[in-house]
Amino acid sequence: MQPRDLSAHAPYVPGRGTEEVARELGMDPEDLTKLSSNENPHGPSPKAVAAIEDAAPTVSVYPKTAHTDLTERLADKWGLAPEQVWVSPGADGSIDYLTRAVLEPDDRILEPAPGFSYYSMSARYHHGDAVQYEVSKDDDFEQTADLVLDAYDGERMVYLTTPHNPTGSVLPREELVELAESVEEHTLLVVDEAYGEFAEEPSAIDLLSEYDNVAALRTFSKAYGLAGLRIGYACVPEAWADAYARVNTPFAASEVACRAALAALDDEEHVEKSVESARWSRDYLREHLDAPTWESEGNFVLVEVGDATAVTEAAQREGVIVRDCGSFGLPECIRVSCGTETQTKRAVDVLNRIVSEVPTA
């Protein structure tokens, strides 16, 4: 007995973790600065931590009330009906739910390149396929409606990442509206706003009252600091009211995750602090790194260093973990997550020294 042929399914490549690098290099994890996964360097809200502790004795019970409470809270936050909010285990869980709701076998999605590999992974898991539109370095990774429409050929789902990972560029509101009014009736625009809290651009969720072909993804992993709990959600058109119950995984969002997310929503001060810190860090990175960078509205900065693998490996040996963007098709670039002031300044010092010493690829 063997699994089906999975040769067309490329595995997801995450940023390297502190424990992984520490074991490999024989270092103390406490001596490492991890800026590879766009996590919140300030951690979760203290209110979320307290909620996790309070919820711990209840983990023997399937989550129902907490899931409902979180759904209703998010619906109220965004001015939607509860049926329009699909809570999921991370934003990637929402990607799966939307794929199940939309794709028939052999349907295609259109996704950005470079971009989040799970868009196409989910499509292929569900017997669909993927084609790409290029967010080009030659154009400073600018995102426009024309860029997408030039590649569009009636795909059932079109993914738009704003802010875009790993570049930090945004799709302006007027460009999104143009897309919503230009694609065919059967096409769903999926706007991935995992990094939306860090951007100035308004959320696509505001458009759901006007357009029935737009859905938006959000997560608690970034600005809210709950990456380890895997909790996110999609906001979908009102006409989709009964679809969630038919496509979601039973009890996929845990009781602890839902309670922590509810508490995190109550701590706006922590989110504001996290966003302000990220904006300071990305400005500092762009101003002080001795290498080309691009304007970013995420909690990270893309940096051109010549040989990303060499720079990444050298930085690790000096205790700074950053993301080699070779897996994004950018072997000359690294992505540096926004850290605390101390972490950011350490990263700049280490990277500037390494970039001056590592030969250009």
Curated annotation (Swiss-Prot):
What cofactor is this protein dependent on? pyridoxal 5'-phosphate
Catalyzed reaction equations: L-histidinol phosphate + 2-oxoglutarate = 3-(imidazol-4-yl)-2-oxopropyl phosphate + L-glutamate
SUPFAM superfamilies, alphabetically?
PLP-dependent transferases
Location of the region described as Disordered in the Swiss-Prot/TrEMBL record: 26-45
Which Enzyme Commission number(s) are on file for it? 2.6.1.9
Q: Name a Pfam family for this protein.
A: Aminotran_1_2
Which UniProt keyword terms apply here?
A: Amino-acid biosynthesis, Aminotransferase, Histidine biosynthesis, Pyridoxal phosphate, Transferase
Which GO biological process annotations does it have? L-histidine biosynthetic process
* UniProt similarity note: Belongs to the class-II pyridoxal-phosphate-dependent aminotransferase family. Histidinol-phosphate aminotransferase subfamily.
* Top-rank taxon, per record: Archaea
What's one GO MF term for it? pyridoxal phosphate binding
Q: What is this protein called?
A: Histidinol-phosphate aminotransferase
Fetch the PROSITE patterns from UniProt. Answer: AA_TRANSFER_CLASS_2
- What organism, scientifically named, is this protein from? Haloferax volcanii (strain ATCC 29605 / DSM 3757 / JCM 8879 / NBRC 14742 / NCIMB 2012 / VKM B-1768 / DS2) (Halobacterium volcanii)
| Residues modified to N6-(pyridoxal phosphate)lysine | 222
Q: Where is the signal peptide?
A: none
Gene3D superfamilies associated with the record = Aspartate Aminotransferase, domain 1 (3.90.1150.10), Type I PLP-dependent aspartate aminotransferase-like (Major domain) (3.40.640.10)
Q: Report the top EC class in one word.
A: transferase
Q: In which pathway does it act?
A: Amino-acid biosynthesis; L-histidine biosynthesis; L-histidine from 5-phospho-alpha-D-ribose 1-diphosphate: step 7/9
Q: Where are the transmembrane segments?
A: none
